[in-house]
């Protein structure tokens, strides 16, 4: 999907929006924004769900355009993106929940350890929750609205060269 600038921008938008969600949660729960609370945030994990939804939507849009032999209408585009989001929603949610569950034991810590690590765990869980919500709501809607025109699912030069290199080894 990186060949499609709109899809890449929609995926990238999840980072500031989930950070807004995170800072709102931190402010409402009086968690200070410091190195300990924000240090564990990993933008790769935050955009993971969005990447899954965007990849699936682009794949379905490209296949639908190829199948019809023309550009999709707005209704067809919305239908394909909805189907793509529905298809990827459950694995995405379970994957994000598994990562969130890893942080639950940290909430059982007491004393100095609890005071040190609670803000970090809270911040990561809130960021992942925000990213997950955005991935199943904002991302499909934005893809359906803004990814118009000819959609191609193609490998980039790097992937083609890598495939040429390792395909003979596998055979």
Regions found by a protein language model. Give the residues of each.
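Hydrophobic regular secondary-structure detector
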Residues: 1-171
């Amino acid at each position: 999907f990186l060949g499609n600038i709109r899809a890449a921008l929609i995926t990238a938008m999840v980072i500031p929006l989930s950070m807004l969600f995170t800072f709102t949660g931190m402010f409402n729960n009086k968690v200070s924004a410091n190195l300990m609370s924000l240090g564990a945030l990993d933008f790769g994990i935050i955009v993971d769900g969005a990447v899954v939804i965007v990849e699936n939507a682009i794949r379905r849009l490209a296949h639908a355009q190829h199948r019809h032999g023309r550009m999709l209408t707005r209704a067809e585009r919305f239908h394909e993106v909805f189907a793509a989001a529905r298809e990827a929603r459950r694995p995405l949610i379970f994957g994000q929940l598994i990562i969130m569950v890893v942080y639950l034991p940290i909430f059982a810590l007491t004393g100095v350890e609890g005071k040190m690590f609670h803000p970090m765990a809270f911040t990561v869980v809130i960021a992942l929750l925000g990213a997950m919500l955005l991935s199943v709501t904002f991302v499909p809607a934005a893809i359906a609205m803004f990814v118009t025109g000819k959609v191609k699912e193609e490998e980039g030069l790097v992937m083609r060269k890598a495939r040429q290199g390792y395909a003979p080894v596998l055979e």
